[in-house]
Amino acid sequence: MCGIVGYVGRRPAYVVVMDALRRMEYRGYDSSGIALVDGGTLTVRRRAGRLANLEEAVAEMPSTALSGTTGLGHTRWATHGRPTDRNAHPHRDAAGKIAVVHNGIIENFAVLRRELETAGVEFASDTDTEVAAHLVARAYRHGETADDFVGSVLAVLRRLEGHFTLVFANADDPGTLVAARRSTPLVLGIGDNEMFVGSDVAAFIEHTREAVELGQDQAVVITADGYRISDFDGNDGLQAGRDFRPFHIDWDLAAAEKGGYEYFMLKEIAEQPAAVADTLLGHFVGGRIVLDEQRLSDQELREIDKVFVVACGTAYHSGLLAKYAIEHWTRLPVEVELASEFRYRDPVLDRSTLVVAISQSGETADTLEAVRHAKEQKAKVLAICNTNGSQIPRECDAVLYTRAGPEIGVASTKTFLAQIAANYLLGLALAQARGTKYPDEVEREYHELEAMPDLVARVIAATGPVAELAHRFAQSSTVLFLGRHVGYPVALEGALKLKELAYMHAEGFAAGELKHGPIALIEDGLPVIVVMPSPKGSATLHAKLLSNIREIQTRGAVTIVIAEEGDETVRPYADHLIEIPAVSTLLQPLLSTIPLQVFAASVARARGYDVDKPRNLAKSVTVE
């Protein structure tokens, strides 16, 4: 959630830090701050609201501070304390010598705060983070670690409970930063006579593409000349590849910029053909489906007798689509669970269970905890993820990466389509291993998937009328979405996008449930978006949804219908018809989702809202 950056080098730190904070705005935030170290002086500026507020404050900083070459930056998402200037990061000790930025939650902060207050420490904020600054300052000035900055930080880390990333600066040691992580992300960037730390590689992609992913309960000391990684006890005999992971970033700064588009989400919608194509690329070799990091043998896959899919938000909707494909192709029972609910209901898991964890960031806290619960129950766990080397893939038995590239817009678009493609690859891999599909059938299904990027591009190119339609309904108080079979998760996703971006009441329903309550909402002029199944699929399914459209139109609703090209049976009942190319039933969500993305973004723009940074939302949710 929060965005963190730290820099030590030769150039003015404020320039590097502020640029990094701008690139990490997509993570979501409600306040921001910066700390600069120069000549034994620590200068901090913090502001609630948009980053522009902090930029104004930085412009007024003393020139001596702006010449400093060591700095910290932070975009905060409030968990402890309201989003105000005083609660924004960085936080300092009472002497103003130690600064800290933090992502996560220090679970035992109340106990630590009482200890400090009893010792006479006065707090300047309501946050859990401030205790870390005071504890390090006290350790640095007294006891066994006096005058040892690194030792003081390590001593404090051993006392903290919870999930956290922390980065510390010390006015007395201006060329050094100390950073640490437990269960929340921290990446090290290796430059030429400069070093970076950040919540993700967007913090330093402009300056280097060489990075290191820190392991669990590890700390790193960085100077302009290099870095040293240790555990919280100070043991630095750690091995690259085993304990921490060096890697090369396979995208560049241009991928994280708008490239001439008005907003990132529009660019990312346009990138969906490439996202699907790249996710599929290289997964059919020698007549077989192959996964990325396949640490599960075909024999282990044959022994699977039940599948759980765990995810949150948009990824959960992709999981619902995975259920249709995996059950159809493998005849395995599939349950789809919200990751936040999964471990609390005591699911029945064993060695014959496959748990599929879907997460764009690979750091989603609820999904990570679901993975750990599944591992404790001896289930096999496979990750579907867009972030190479992140925490969830590292803890799983196998990985299937979506190759969507960086997604800056908070509301997921291209990663959703890439997740659908990855889910279908997994379904085919399971069918192949279990023998429920003949090799020629697997190959045919894969080649049908391969043809989808061109059709996705066709749909995107034809969404102009959808944007115009969105302006007509931008001031509606409610929009309903209906679907059946694979159209139901698409309806849920369409409603979620409208809620996220346009702050409108929107609900997605299984159309068969219409008479069981939702029909009471239908009134004159209410827009209802219907995702129509192909008439070439189940004739019964198509006929029933056609009947649903008649019912709502009779009651005065305005029907907006997404239907297959050539489906003339629906035309008389559609006040507005959006046509998509004809494809097989399971593949239709890759196309029918796109008009709903454009509709939501266009409504948001018509209402004057920021499409890329909707209020109260974060791209990567790293706390439960």
Curated annotation (Swiss-Prot):
This is Glutamine--fructose-6-phosphate aminotransferase [isomerizing]. Catalyzes the first step in hexosamine metabolism, converting fructose-6P into glucosamine-6P using glutamine as a nitrogen source. Keywords: Aminotransferase, Cytoplasm, Glutamine amidotransferase, Repeat, Transferase. Residues 2-225 form the Glutamine amidotransferase type-2 domain. NCBIfam families: glmS (TIGR01135), PRK00331.1 (NF001484). HAMAP family: GlmS. GO terms for molecular function: carbohydrate derivative binding; glutamine-fructose-6-phosphate transaminase (isomerizing) activity. Its EC number is 2.6.1.16. Residues 297-436, 469-614 form the SIS domain. InterPro entries: GATase_2_dom, GFAT, GFAT_N, GlmS/AgaS_SIS, GlmS/FrlB_SIS, Ntn_hydrolases_N, SIS_dom, SIS_dom_sf. It comes from Mycobacterium tuberculosis (strain ATCC 25618 / H37Rv). It catalyses: D-fructose 6-phosphate + L-glutamine = D-glucosamine 6-phosphate + L-glutamate. It holds the Pfam family GATase_6. CDD domains: GFAT (cd00714), SIS_GlmS_GlmD_1 (cd05008), SIS_GlmS_GlmD_2 (cd05009). Homodimer. GO terms for cellular component: cytosol; plasma membrane.
